[in-house]
């Protein structure tokens, strides 16, 4: 996982952004220590915390369409090994997400805590405990869809209609990491993010 000067993330995006949504599963900048899960959509998706709760806390805007979809609505993990240098030092981990008509949930498991049903290719979200992010109360069928996953692993379509696009990238500086560069401890090691 990148640290200083970077904006690493893994996300899914639909066509005609932000109208068919974006789900940021792993995201942060510079020396952040906690992962941020963010939804971006057209205006009007104002999710609540879903049934069963979440371990993370709400951050940013209530409306996932804030700022024309650019800002989004987020949940920040409460697990110190979920991002950045602690993630790396801990040997990484596994993120799992579940997207249904009624909720979008994301779990994080440190490398040593990955459930056996995930390791054995038989995932059972009902056994994973409370997710770090649990978005509910939005019309997810309207705001999120037609997303494609680009992966080296073969994927199956569910009901023949969902395609996903998953992107993992590490942006050097960029809009977000560059904008908060001066307020991070990274600025002490380099006077600019350029």
Model-derived segments and their meaning:
Residues 1-194:
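GH16 jelly-roll
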């Amino acid at each position: 996982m990148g640290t200083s000067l970077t904006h690493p993330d893994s996300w899914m995006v639909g066509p005609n952004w932000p109208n068919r949504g974006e789900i940021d599963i792993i995201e942060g900048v510079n020396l952040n220590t906690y992962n941020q899960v963010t939804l971006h959509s057209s205006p009007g998706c104002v999710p609540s915390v879903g049934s069963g709760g979440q371990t993370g806390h709400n951050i940013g805007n209530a409306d996932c369409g804030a700022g024309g979809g650019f800002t989004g609505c987020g949940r920040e993990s409460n697990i110190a090994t979920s991002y950045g240098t602690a993630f790396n030092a801990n040997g990484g981990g596994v993120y799992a997400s579940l997207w249904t008509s009624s909720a979008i949930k994301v779990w994080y498991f440190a490398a040593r805590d990955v459930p056996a049903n995930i390791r054995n290719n038989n995932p059972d979200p009902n056994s994973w405990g409370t997710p770090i992010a649990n978005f509910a109360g939005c019309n997810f069928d309207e705001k999120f869809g037609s997303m494609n996953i680009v992966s080296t692993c073969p994927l199956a379509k569910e009901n023949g209609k969902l395609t996903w696009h998953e992107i993992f990238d590490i942006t050097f500086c960029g809009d977000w990491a560059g904008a908060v560069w001066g307020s991070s401890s990274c600025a002490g090691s380099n006077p600019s993010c350029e």
